[in-house]
Amino acid sequence: MTRATNFTELYAGKGILDTYMVAEKITRYYTQDLIQLSGLSESSLTPLVILDLACGTGVVSDALHDMLNFQPKGNWELTCGDISTELTGHVKQKILERGWENSIAKVVDAQNTELPTGHYTHVFAALAFTSFPDTYAAMKEVMRILQPGGTLTISTWQRTEWLAVVEAAVAIIPADLPFPTTKEFMSCMNPGWDSEDYVHSRFEEAGFHSVQVTTISKQFETSVEDLYKIAQPVIPIIVSKWWNQEQRDKYENDILPALQRHLNETYGENGLVPQEWTAVFATGQKGS
């Protein structure tokens, strides 16, 4: 795993697939809400031309195939795009193994997709906009590639409880070490996307109408092992932003052992960690 000090480096680095394979166990809980909000099943546009933008391991694409499997293949097509060659390669293999003849996967930069203008009926971007270096460019690009009457539907994290577990582990270290609040962490790259009002305003500012925004929470349990794997690659980002050089030099290497100890002592070596994560969902249409 690449040691990334910001999210752009993390997504572009080696080993991101391993992290996503763990994270998809959680992100799957939120895919049906995303698709339902889009109104895809009631769409009058035909054929359906769908883009899964920042597709990751393809959890949204999985759900789309489950939902539309009864449709003749000529009635819909799917493009899976991600900036990561590692993730795109994984989805390409999935397409081959599952025989998704109407689907392709390709490397796509959300800010400059190089995809055709006015082509897609629906664009999905699940839990992605906070990771785009330029969200204004990404919004403009989605508007360009949508057909008239097409729909953008997104989700973004508002609250994820794994951060509190890491904070408790850092508190074990015998030093007065700063730690971000959830709000501060969620805002460290693209502030505002954890707010319904902000997301609504960004959709309208980009020219979308019939905008709907809602917040949905899910309760679940994740294994001690998986929570450790989720936190591990993000810790360098936290210490790079909130710790000074002296603190990093002295204590960064203590965090993972402290996290493992805290997890084992609190939940058991093979235990489950109760979690409640909250996401903001939004959808809007391009004018016809």
UniProtKB/Swiss-Prot annotation:
Applied use = The indole alkaloid meleagrin was shown to be a good candidate to control c-Met-dependent breast cancer proliferation, migration and invasion.
The text of the family note is: Belongs to the class I-like SAM-binding methyltransferase superfamily.
GO MF terms held by the record: hydrolase activity; methyltransferase activity
**Any single GO BP term:** methylation
EC number(s) for this protein? 3.1.1.-
Q: Which UniProt keywords apply?
A: Hydrolase, Methyltransferase, S-adenosyl-L-methionine, Transferase
- Residues binding S-adenosyl-L-methionine: 57, 82, 109-110
Q: Which domain of life is it from?
A: Eukaryota
Induction statement: Expression is decreased in presence of phenylacetic acid (PAA).
Gene encoding this chain? roqN
State the protein's name: Glandicoline B O-methyltransferase roqN
Q: Give the organism the record lists.
A: Penicillium rubens (strain ATCC 28089 / DSM 1075 / NRRL 1951 / Wisconsin 54-1255)
